[in-house]
């Protein structure tokens, strides 16, 4: 039976239907017969996985590399960890009375139920909530990194189901680049942070100075959104061998700075003062007459207004190197030298994203673009700026060949009527707690007044919001408000332990999929082959939502799957890539042959793409290749933002002091840096054996400057309590001179493990502030926080972050 979208809604709403729980696909014959090493992939690259007696025993990278990637050793941990969710579970109080549970989330025991019971309960309560409140009451934004693959995309599969059900509230933006991706379209006409960069071969050939501003590629290039092609680290290795001078601007002496060693000059400003430092450099360029007036006149708009601010004409405060030195802690002479070095050489300004994950984060990348414009090197080989060299191997030239399409949340012929009638909405992703606290509340976002939905149901699939969201204790309180929360997940994360219904999902090693390597290069197609059978009662998201679609109305499963099972979808995606490759005269084997060969496919080099210069066409002809801004030029002053009238995001790059920084700290407060960890992908793998490489006394480490440690009586290896008005955490001390005095670093991503108000595992977001970057982007500001530290002298509480929750027999 084939139903149109209108017939589907008309005949069913969300009426109950017969449920037949389909099992996960059987283990393919090739895995049983061949055993040994199986080719697959993850965010951290293509891997060979060794299987013995139905268990993964080891995993190694499948691509040659100079710099090892520790994350590629974790496949066995991912599948066989004791933190796995083994069975469908329902919170006892919720199971007893879904309409009025006796206990709050996070305080209850769980009850094991069958898959049929779990899906029936979800369906009934989803139906009730949707009918009573409409689609906007269902939040299925479900942000998170999930797993690699073009089919088994947890959030997409959830949203595909919710579209069939009649729509949902989603999210806009992300936690990684929330501020930059909203401001950059006003400045350069694109989100910029996810764009291909000037090619690495041109950097190595033409750049004379490379500035790494707030980025640590030796950590962040271990991963990619699809799967890393591993070329970014190879290019940084070549940059090191070239001997070119590298300027690293970062409050902490990162792994990347250590890697470059004598090639790198480390400059450590006070946290959050990057705009002031850039302004000091810009003022020096201007006063020395080293700014490129011709470039500014031809390719930008609004520089005269900005120069009035720079000189102090508009506010009586010249943004000189002396002024910048007082704010940043960087000596005046060094600021002047930086300006002179950048102006005298072909300079590439590479910037990371941590600098914009701060209050007023929009200003950081805007000011860096302005600085690059003053240097006049944008659009030249090896000059200008780039915001993705640290992410997914930006700058690795795009290959020629096939590109895999991906599963869509939309279903052919079945567009959501809710979207058509305005019944769907999206909130800025980092404002989820604001939305829960203020249903129906008004807020400003990117020039428009918007309204928070009244969220009654949340489904989180493949994401750890209790780890990536700021101010965990505030989140926990807001999390009590919805009527139902479902988490479908592989592991007992803190989010899962605060859900009403928890569904066990397969890891990528327990199912079949495909992925590209290189989000910019599209260098390889990799078969993500199932290595072992689904563990315990784990099922694929695809099968779970297909069964729920059948409960919407008989025939719903057929609509959801479009009549294709796992392998049929993979063949469909592969065939589309093969067709695209053929159009470019690149040969790919037929799907069945490709799948049996257990080999990846590498796409063809492109000499043209190896010569790619970001903004090269714009520089060559700014009229023909105008940018997507109102003026068609780089907007140093934005008339659009002037009309918005936001005091927290003025019309040109501006130094705005955050609420919590060195300038507002008392004598005992330190600034908190929440950097990306070396041996995790955010919160992923926190349970893995790699933990032994970094944990101190089985806690998340805290990096403390030697003088600060001495001041507070802390020695290397001590347990340290870190706290502020938002919460407290327990960490292990790493004492070093390799961090700015007055700054401490706790890497983001540790799983929250709260007991009597203390996070025993050291989750940084227990301490960070849940405030918006500004009214423009409403992005997260996790790097704007002050904390206190002290040596912990009590008995160390037992870590329980990775334990199973209490289950009623």
Curated annotation (Swiss-Prot):
It catalyses: trimethylamine + 2 Fe(III)-[cytochrome c] + H2O = trimethylamine N-oxide + 2 Fe(II)-[cytochrome c] + 3 H(+). PROSITE patterns: MOLYBDOPTERIN_PROK_2 (PS00490), MOLYBDOPTERIN_PROK_3 (PS00932), TAT (PS51318). Coiled coil: none annotated. InterPro entries: Asp_de-COase-like_dom_sf (IPR009010), BisC (IPR006658), CT_DMSOR/BSOR/TMAOR (IPR041954), Molybdopterin_N (IPR041460), MoPterin_dinucl-bd_dom (IPR006657), Mopterin_OxRdtase (IPR006656), Mopterin_OxRdtase_prok_CS (IPR006655), Prok_Mopterin_Oxidored (IPR050612). Mo-bis(molybdopterin guanine dinucleotide) binds at residue 176. Binds 1 molybdenum-bis(molybdopterin guanine dinucleotide) (Mo-bis-MGD) cofactor per subunit. Its cofactor is Mo-bis(molybdopterin guanine dinucleotide). The keyword Signal applies. Exported by the Tat system. The position of the signal peptide cleavage has been experimentally proven. Can also be exported by the Sec system. Keywords: Metal-binding, Molybdenum, Oxidoreductase, Periplasm, Signal. Its main location: periplasm. GO terms for biological process: anaerobic respiration. Residues 1-31 form the signal peptide. It is found in: Periplasm. Transmembrane segments: none annotated. GO terms for molecular function: electron transfer activity; molybdenum ion binding; molybdopterin cofactor binding; trimethylamine-N-oxide reductase (cytochrome c) activity. It is an enzyme of class 1 (oxidoreductase). Pfam families: Molybdopterin (PF00384), Molybdopterin_N (PF18364), Molydop_binding (PF01568). One of its GO terms (cellular component) is outer membrane-bounded periplasmic space. Its EC number is 1.7.2.3. The keyword Nucleotide-binding does not apply. Belongs to the prokaryotic molybdopterin-containing oxidoreductase family. Reduces trimethylamine-N-oxide (TMAO) into trimethylamine; an anaerobic reaction coupled to energy-yielding reactions. Can also reduce other N- and S-oxide compounds such as 4-methylmorpholine-N-oxide and biotin sulfoxide (BSO), but with a lower catalytic efficiency. Expression of torYZ allows E.coli to grow anaerobically on a wider range of substrates than does expression of torCAD. This is Trimethylamine-N-oxide reductase 2.
């Amino acid at each position: 039976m084939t139903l149109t979208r209108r017939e589907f809604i008309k005949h069913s709403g969300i009426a109950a239907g017969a449920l037949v729980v389909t099992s996960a696909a059987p283990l393919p014959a090739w895995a049983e017969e061949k055993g040994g090493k199986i080719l697959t992939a993850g965010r951290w690259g293509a891997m060979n996985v060794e299987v013995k007696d139905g268990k993964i025993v080891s995993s190694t990278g499948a691509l040659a590399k100079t710099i090892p990637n520790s994350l590629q050793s974790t496949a066995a941990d991912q599948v066989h960890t004791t933190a796995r969710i083994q069975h469908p579970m329902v919170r006892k109080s919720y199971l007893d009375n879904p309409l009025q549970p006796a206990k709050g989330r996070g305080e209850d025991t769980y009850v094991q139920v069958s898959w049929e019971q779990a899906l029936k309960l979800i369906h009934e309560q989803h139906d009730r909530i949707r009918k009573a409140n409409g689609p906007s009451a269902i939040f299925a934004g479900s942000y998170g990194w999930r797993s690699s693959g073009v089919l088994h995309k947890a959030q997409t599969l959830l949203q595909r189901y919710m579209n069939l059900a009649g729509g949902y509230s989603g999210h806009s933006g992300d936690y990684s680049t929330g501020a930059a991706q909203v401001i950059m379209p006003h400045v350069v006409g694109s989100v910029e942070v996810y764009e291909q960069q000037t090619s690495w071969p041109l950097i190595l050939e033409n750049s004379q100075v490379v500035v790494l501003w707030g980025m640590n590629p030796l950590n962040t290039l271990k991963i990619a959104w699809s799967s890393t092609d591993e070329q970014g680290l190879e290019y940084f290795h070549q940059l090191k061998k070239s001997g070119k001078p590298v300027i690293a601007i970062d409050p902490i002496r990162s792994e990347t700075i250590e890697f470059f060693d004598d090639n790198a000059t480390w400059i450590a400003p006070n946290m959050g003062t990057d705009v002031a430092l850039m302004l000091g450099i810009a003022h020096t360029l201007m006063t020395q007459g080293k700014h490129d007036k011709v470039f500014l006149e031809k390719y930008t708009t609004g520089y005269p207004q900005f120069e009035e601010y720079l000189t102090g004409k508009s506010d009586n405060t010249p943004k000189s190197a002396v002024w910048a030195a007082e704010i940043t802690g960087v000596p005046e002479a060094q600021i002047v030298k930086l300006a002179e070095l950048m102006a005298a050489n072909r300079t590439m300004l590479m910037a990371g994203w941590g600098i914009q994950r701060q209050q007023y984060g929009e200003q950081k990348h805007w000011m860096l673009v302005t600085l690059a414009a003053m240097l006049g090197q944008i659009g030249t080989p090896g000059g200008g700026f780039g915001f993705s060299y640290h992410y997914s191997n930006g700058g690795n030239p795009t290959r020629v060949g096939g590109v895999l399409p991906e599963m869509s949340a939309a279903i052919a012929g079945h567009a959501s009527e809710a979207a058509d009638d305005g019944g769907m909405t999206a909130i800025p992703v980092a404002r989820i707690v604001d939305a829960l606290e203020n249903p129906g509340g008004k807020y400003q976002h990117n020039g428009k007044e918007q309204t928070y939905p009244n969220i009654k149901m949340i489904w989180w699939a493949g994401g750890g919001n209790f780890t990536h969201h700021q101010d965990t204790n505030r989140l926990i309180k807001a999390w009590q408000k919805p009527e139902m929360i479902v988490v479908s997940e592989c592991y007992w994360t803190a989010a899962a332990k605060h859900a009403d219904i928890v569904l066990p999902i397969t890891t990528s090693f327990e199912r079949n999929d495909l992925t590209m390597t290189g989000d910019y290069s599209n260098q390889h197609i990799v078969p993500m082959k199932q290595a072992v059978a689904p563990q315990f009662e784990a099922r694929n998201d695809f099968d779970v939502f297909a069964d729920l679609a059948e409960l919407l109305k008989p025939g719903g499963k057929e609509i959801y799957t479009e009549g294709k099972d796992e392998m049929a979808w993979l063949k469909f995606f592969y065939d589309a890539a093969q067709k695209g490759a053929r159009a470019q005269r690149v040969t790919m084997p037929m799907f069945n042959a490709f799948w049996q060969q257990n080999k990846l496919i590498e796409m063809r080099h492109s000499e043209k793409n190896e010569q790619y210069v970001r903004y090269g066409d714009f520089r060559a002809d700014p009229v023909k290749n105008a940018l997507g801004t109102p003026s068609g030029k780089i907007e140093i002053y934005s008339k659009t933002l002037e009309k918005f009238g936001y005091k927290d995001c003025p019309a040109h790059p501006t130094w705005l002091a955050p609420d919590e920084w060195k300038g507002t700290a008392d004598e005992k407060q330190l600034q908190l840096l929440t950097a990306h960890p070396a041996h995790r992908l955010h919160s992923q793998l926190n349970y893995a054996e790699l933990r032994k490489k970094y944990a101190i006394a089985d806690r998340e480490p805290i990096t403390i400057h030697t003088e600060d440690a001495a001041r507070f009586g802390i020695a290397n290896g001590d347990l340290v309590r870190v706290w502020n008005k938002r919460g407290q955490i327990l960490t292990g001390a790493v004492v070093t001179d390799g961090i700015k005095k007055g700054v401490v670093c706790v890497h983001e991503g540790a799983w929250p493990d709260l007991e009597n108000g203390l996070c025993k595992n050291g989750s940084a977001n227990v301490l960070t502030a849940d405030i918006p970057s500004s009214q423009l982007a409403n992005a997260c500001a996790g790097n704007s926080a002050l904390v206190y530290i002290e040596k912990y002298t009590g008995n160390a509480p037992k870590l329980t972050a990775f334990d199973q929750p209490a289950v009623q027999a």
